[in-house]
From Swiss-Prot:
Receptor for kinesin thus involved in kinesin-driven vesicle motility. Accumulates in integrin-based adhesion complexes (IAC) upon integrin aggregation by fibronectin. Residues 73-86, 111-135 have a biased composition (Basic and acidic residues). Residues 329-1327 form a coiled coil. Expressed in all tissues examined including 12-day embryo, adult heart, brain, ovary, kidney, lung, small intestine, spleen, thymus and pancreas. It comes from Mus musculus. This is Kinectin. Keywords: Coiled coil, Endoplasmic reticulum, Glycoprotein, Membrane, Phosphoprotein, Signal-anchor, Transmembrane, Transmembrane helix. The lineage of its organism: Eukaryota, Metazoa, Chordata, Craniata, Vertebrata. It comes from the Eukaryota. Residues 49-181, 197-216 are annotated as: Disordered. Residues 30-1327 are lumenal. It is a single-pass type II membrane protein. InterPro entries: Kinectin (IPR024854), Rib_rcpt_KP (IPR007794).
């Protein structure tokens, strides 16, 4: 408990306020006493101790002054009690509230003992005071009132006894001892009074609230003390510090007491007339001198005792004055005490009220705390639940975020792996390029070295040719041999070229095959993309079809709701008819009561009671039927709730089945069959709905017929009322009977129609049973399909959608069945209403018979009225009433016409509303068609976007090759393609079926429009018929009124043939003129007696007239009441309609909310499906990339093999060059041998000069060949590796070999460079 919540704090506030109020009053009353105390304290502070040396002189002066002023002391002593009176009575009220006692250390027990002892010691105290005054010579008492404290402290009992003993002794001996004891006794109360004066302000606040009872007791005790002990008031205690100070204080107090008493003595000395003014002035001067001397004197013990004795001598006068003054003051004090007690009682009451308020506030605070604690607990629970939900949601978000991060990390890892692999491939390509460049550089260096060597050889050969021109013949033979070797080398080179061409053709074939494979893969990829697009389009088409089916279901639900509202309106109309019948029954009961009052027939009353009992039973039956309908509605609401729960369960199952997203083509044909059966069922349901609409329209017409019959009955009842008031003829009764017969026939026709309707309902129930059987078979088939789907998980989503559709169709069928049941109940209620109407018609027949009897009785009564004046007046009144009735009828006819128009207008408005609803439905369907077209366009756009996305994915596939681990075979791809093609065909068929459904719906809308126009024409024809009927009835009524007027005129003319009135006048004016002339005729012929008789009869007629008027007024009041009841009923019906509309709106809102939730769940499903598809696409892309990576690796391996083959070719070529080099060495050796032979034959050449010419010719040819070789070597940068150091062979033999070798080397180098360039280009393309 905190401080502000504790009850102590609440209790302390009012107590503090009360203490503050008391302190305020106490301080206000205590101001005089407080001023006196301040003055006394100042006086005490001004006392100055005189010197001891001047005591004797002062004593002498005091003795002289006492002798001189002896008389004055007596007069002054008389005034001392008055001073006491003024000092005690003025602050008495304030002194009573001083809280602190004299002895602060005393306990409550000692205080009680002292209060008891005060009463006993009052006489002893008086004696003690007298004895002390006689015995003591030192004035040791201060004149102060005892009422300064609440409990005056009397002397203890031991001290009182000692004082009594000392009083018996001599004064002279024991004076000093008594003075010492008095000083000791006075010390304690004086000290206590100092404590009180110092702590008075602080203790007043706390003491007032605690000791109110003690203050009240002490007030009464102090008053008693004032009455009984006047001398004690003059002897209060003061503190005494030492002997000198006591003396000075006594003198000071005596002077203070004498000053006011002297003034009073001067006022009272007016009685002493003998004294002279001069003596008074001298006495005043002496008294002033005496006062001054007292102020400066220091008394001894003897002198003080003398002063006390003189004062005691004057004490008798003081007692008398005190008694006189106290008597006047007691009444004032008592009055003040009473007022203060009243104030205290009022303050106590206020305190009690404040305590009660505090208690109430505490209770309210406790209740509010409890409420707040409950609210806080609820809020804490709510906050806890919200925090839990928030934590769960955060955990879900965190998990999803972690999953996304994991996916991103995986994707980054894949990218990094791809980049690493790409870098590795680039490195390998660089290595290969470096190797190729190194090989080319090496070949070029070798060729350049060989060319240099060849040049050197050519120079040497030229020199040798110049020297050895004579040896050409032998060289010719050698040339032939060399030519043969060259031909062999050429053949070998041709074979090498053929092998190179074969290698190139093999490489080209491999590249062509690789390109064809790539093209095949690209075509397959394009086909797959097309398949994906087709699947996407199929899914979108299926979604669109689902949405269309949902929209159709919503339309069906809305139409059912509209039908329910129409049926409710029909029920309301039936209730209105029943209420109108009840009102008519009430009117009939009132008529019966009036007739019973006139005829006093008990039999009629009993019959009426029976009828009322029967009608009460019927009402109870209707109420029971209404209760059953309400129970049925409650059961329907429970069924709706069950359906909603089923929907939620189905949604949960849908979420479970979403994981199984793989599709297969095994159940496609079965799905198509199911869809066809569903379409057939939808057509059947539409036919049933149309039949129900026709039935509702027929029942509406039947209700209209019943309402018209009810109106006709009401009009007939009104006719009966007017007939009773106007005494109609028997023809009217016959007409009523005919009308009743016609109504019986109509009721029979209605019963027949109801029977036919029941037959139709039975047939429809059979149809519904057949549909149920079909649905049961379909559900079984669906269950079988589920069993199949456990093995084959494909097309699960489609089957689930079909299940949903089947469930929805079952729900629709159930709703149709419920509607049929409701219609059966309505038919039963209508049959009950028909029976009630039959009973009412029978009752009306009985009432008509009773009315006929009553009319006969009234005719017998009216036949007694024979005299002319009564007849005239009666006829005039009848004519007036007829006029009023005619006017009322005209008004009623107009009102009925308006009512009929109003009745027709709401029906017309209902039909118009129906037409508008149909038009709105047509517009909705058109809007849906437009939406479908827009959806198709959107789908085409989506396809384009998907194609673009596929292109983008292709680009991504090139980056994600290494993630592909497995690739499906071509057979699986073909199966998938065939399945997708089948799905595409199915979707096309569905599109065609949807288009046919749209066209069928358009045809239906056109038919509905035509029907609406026909209904409008039928309404117009019915309105015309109603207007014609109204006109006919008004004409008939006017003719009837005119016939009655003519009959009345003829009657009057027959009665008074002498009276003549012009016939051109109106009926009312004609009656007035006829009345005046008839009165004139009767006045001339009648006698006094006849006049009296006539007057008597006139009075009777007037009484009858008044009675009839009263009855008319009653009927009018009844009609007004019925109209008011009808208006109230209409209002109640309108209110109920508004309530039902509100409920319908709420149900529609609930349905919309459910639809929105369903659409949201569908969107989530679509989103999940798309995510699954994306995952599948990514998986496929991964597989495709892995396949491509494998292909790239295969290509890489092929390239490596090709490079190896090229290296092998290079090695073979090098081997061939080495062989040619060895052959060249061998030929050099042969040339050396030939040189030796040439040296041998050199001698022979000198002889053969004839042959030198030939050699010269050969040399010329050799020079030409050498020039050609030099030109070829300068053009080409290739040469032979053969080094011929010392060759004696002629240049004509070596030149063709060099040429052939250089040509072959150049060709091989160019071919190798081309191959390397092609390899580099392919690698760059792949990267």
């Amino acid at each position: 408990m905190e401080l502000y919540e504790s009850t102590y704090f609440i209790v302390l506030i009012p107590s503090v306020v009360i203490t503050v109020i008391f302190l305020f009053f106490w301080l206000f009353m205590k101001e005089t006493l407080y001023d006196e105390v301040l003055a006394k304290q100042k006086r005490e502070q001004k006392l100055i101790s005189t010197k001891t040396d001047k005591k004797k002189a002062e004593k002498k002066k005091n003795k002289k002054k006492e002798i001189q002023n002896g008389t004055l002391r007596e007069s002054d002593s008389e005034h001392v009690p008055r001073d006491f009176k003024l000092s005690d009575a003025s602050p008495a009220e304030d002194e009573q509230f001083v809280p602190a006692p004299l002895n602060v250390a005393e306990t409550s027990s000692s205080v009680r003992e002292r209060q008891k002892k005060e009463k006993k010691q009052k006489p002893s105290l008086e004696e003690q005071v007298i004895k002390e005054s006689d015995a003591s010579k030192i004035p040791g008492k201060k004149v102060e009132p005892v009422l300064v404290t609440k409990q005056p402290a009397p002397p203890p009992p031991l001290e009182a006894a000692a004082l009594k003993k000392k009083a018996g002794q001599k004064k002279s001996k024991n004076g000093s001892e008594e003075q010492d004891k008095k000083v000791e006794m006075l010390m304690a109360p004086s000290k206590e009074q100092d404590v009180l004066l110092s702590h008075q302000d602080t203790k007043q606040e706390g003491g007032l609230g605690k000791k109110k009872g003690l203050s009240k007791k002490q007030k009464s005790e102090n008053v008693a003390v004032l009455v009984d002990e006047p001398l004690i008031h003059a002897t209060t205690y003061m503190p005494l510090d030492n002997a000198n100070s006591n003396l000075m204080m006594d003198k000071r107090e005596i002077i203070d007491m004498i000053k006011p008493d002297h003034v009073e003595g001067i006022q009272k000395s007016g009685t002493k007339k003998l004294k002279i003014e001069t003596d008074k002035e001298n006495a005043e001067v002496k008294f002033k001198d005496f006062l001054l001397s007292l102020k400066t004197m220091m008394f001894s013990e003897d002198e003080a005792l003398c002063v006390v004795d003189l004062l005691k001598e004057k004490s008798g006068v003081i007692k008398e004055a005190l008694k006189k003054s106290n008597k006047g003051e007691l009444s004032g004090l008592l009055h003040q005490l009473q007022e203060k007690e009243r104030l205290l009682s009022a303050m106590k009451e206020d305190a009690a009220a404040s305590k009660e308020r505090c208690k109430r506030l505490t209770q309210e605070m406790m209740t509010e705390k409890e409420r707040s604690s409950v609210v806080i607990a609820r809020m804490k629970d709510r906050i806890g639940t919200l925090e839990k939900e928030h934590n769960i949601f955060q955990n879900k978000m965190h998990a999803s975020y972690q999953e996304t991060q994991q996916m991103q990390m995986k994707f980054q890892q894949v990218q990094e792996q791809m980049e690493a692999e790409i870098a590795h491939l680039k490195q390998e390509n660089g290595i290969l390029r470096d190797a190729v460049s190194n090989t080319t550089n090496q070949l070029e260096s070798k060729q350049s070295a060989e060319l240099n060597k060849l040049r050197q050889d050519c120079g040497r050969l030229v020199s040798e040719l110049n020297e050895k021109t004579g040896k050409l013949q032998q060289e010719g033979v050698q040339k032939k041999n060399a030519e043969q070797a060259a031909t062999q080398l050429k053949v070998q080179l041709q074979e090498a070229e053929r092998r190179w061409e074969e290698v190139q053709s093999y490489i080209r074939k491999r590249t062509a095959e690789h390109e064809a494979a790539q093209q095949d893969l690209q075509s397959k990829f394009v086909a797959k993309e097309n398949e994906v697009q087709s699947l996407h389009s199929k899914l979108t088409d299926t979604l669109v079809s689902k949405q269309q089916l949902e929209q159709r279901l919503m339309q069906l639900m809305e139409s059912e709701q509209k039908r329910a509202s129409k049926e409710e309106s029909l029920q309301i109309q039936v209730q209105d008819i029943l209420e109108q019948n009840e009102a008519l029954k009430a009117q009939i009961q009132q008529f019966h009561s009036q007739i019973a009052a006139q005829t006093s027939a008990s039999v009629l009353a009993e019959e009426l009671h029976k009828v009322i009992a029967e009608k009460d039973k019927q009402l109870k039956q209707t109420e029971d039927s209404l209760a059953n309908e309400q129970d049925h509605l409650a059961s329907k609401e429970e069924e709706l709730k069950d359906v909603q729960n089923m929907n939620f369960l189905l949604k949960a199952e849908v979420q479970k089945w979403q994981a199984l997203a793989n599709e297969q083509a095994a159940t496609a044909h079965e799905v198509e069959k199911m869809q066809k059966s569903i379409h057939v069922k939808e057509d059947e349901i539409r036919l049933l709905e149309e039949q129900l609409q026709h039935e509702v329209a027929s029942k509406m017409e039947e209700l209209k017929i019943l309402s018209e019959q009810n109106k006709a009955l009401q009009s007939e009842v009104r006719k009966l009322q007017t007939a009773v008031s106007q005494q109609p003829n028997k023809d009217v009764v016959e007409q009523m009977e005919k009308c009743i017969q016609e109504k019986d026939e109509k009721l029979r026709t209605v019963e027949e129609l109801l029977e036919t309707g029941l037959i139709q309902v039975a047939t429809r129930e059979e149809e519904l049973s057949a549909i149920r059987t079909e649905n049961s078979t379909l559900t079984r088939e669906v269950q079988e399909l589920k069993a199949k789907q456990s093995d084959q998980v494909s097309f699960v989503s489609l089957i689930e959608d079909l299940k949903r559709v089947i469930h929805e169709k079952d729900g629709q069928i159930k709703s149709v069945e419920e509607l049929l049941e409701v219609e059966l109940l309505k038919v039963a209620n209508k049959e009950k209403t028909v029976q009630a109407l039959k009973q009412e018609i029978e009752v009306l027949k009985e009432e008509i018979g009773n009315a006929q009897l009553e009319k006969a009785h009234q005719l017998s009564v009216t036949s007694q009225v024979q005299e002319l004046q009564n007849l005239l007046r009666g006829k005039e009144e009848q004519v007036n009433s007829m006029k009023a009735a005619l006017e009322d009828r005209d008004r009623g006819l107009t009102g009925r016409g308006t009512c009929a128009q109003v009745c027709s207008t709401p029906q017309f408005e209902e039909l118009e509303s129906v037409l508008k609803e149909k038009d709105n439905e047509i517009k909705r369907i058109e809007v849906k068609l437009k939406d479908t077209e827009s959806d198709v366009s959107k789908m085409s756009e989506l396809l384009k976007e998907v194609q673009e996305e596929n292109k983008f994915l292709k680009c991504q596939l090139s980056h994600q090759k290494h993630q592909q681990a497995s690739f499906p075979s071509q057979e699986e791809l073909q199966t998938v393609i065939s399945e997708k093609e089948k799905e595409i065909t199915d979707l096309c068929n569905e599109l065609e079926s949807l288009k046919n459904a749209v066209e069928h719906q358009r045809k239906k809308n056109n038919d509905l429009r035509e029907k609406n126009w026909e209904a409008m024409e039928a309404l117009a024809s019915t309105e015309k018929m109603l207007q014609d009927r109204v006109n006919k009835t008004s004409k008939e009524r006017r003719q009837h009124v005119e016939a009655i007027e003519l009959e009345s005129k003829d009657l009057l003319k027959r009665l008074f043939p002498t009276v003549s009135v012009p016939s051109n006048l109106n009926y009312s004016e004609w009656l007035r003129g006829f009345e005046k002339k008839a009165k004139a005729c009767v006045a001339g012929t009648s006698d006094a007696e006849a006049v009296k008789v006539l007057e008597h009869r006139l009075k009777e007629a007037s009484e009858m007239h008044t009675l009839l008027q009263l009855e008319c007024e009653k009927y009018k009041s009844v009609l007004a009441e019925t109209e008011g009841i009808l208006q109230k009923l209409q209002r109640s019906v309108e209110q109920e309609e508004s309530k039902w509309k509100i409920k319908a709106d709420e149900s529609q809102r609930m349905i919309k909310q459910m639809q929105s939730s369903f659409t949201a769940s569908e969107r989530e499903l679509e989103r999940l499906r798309q995510e699954n598809k994306d995952m599948e696409n990514l998986r496929r892309e991964r597989e495709h990339l892995e396949m491509e990576l494998e292909k790239a690796e295969m290509e890489r391996s092929t390239y490596v093999m090709e490079v190896r083959e090229l290296k092998d070719l290079l090695t073979e070529l090098q081997k061939k060059l080495d062989d040619s080099y060895s052959e060249a060495v061998r030929q050099n050796e042969e040339l050396n041998l030939l040189k030796t032979q040439l040296n041998e034959t050199h001698s022979k050449l000198q002889n053969e000069q004839t042959e030198r010419k030939k050699v010269a010719d050969d040399l010329h040819k050799a020079q030409q060949s050498l020039n050609s070789i030099h030109s070829k070597i300068s053009l080409k940068a290739a040469g032979d590796t053969v080094v011929i150091e010392n060759s004696d062979i002629s240049p004509e033999m070596e030149s063709p070999e060099k040429e052939t070798m250089s040509v072959s080397l150049n060709q091989t180098v160019t071919q190798l460079q081309q191959l390397l360039q092609e390899v580099n280009q392919q690698l760059t393309k792949e990267t």
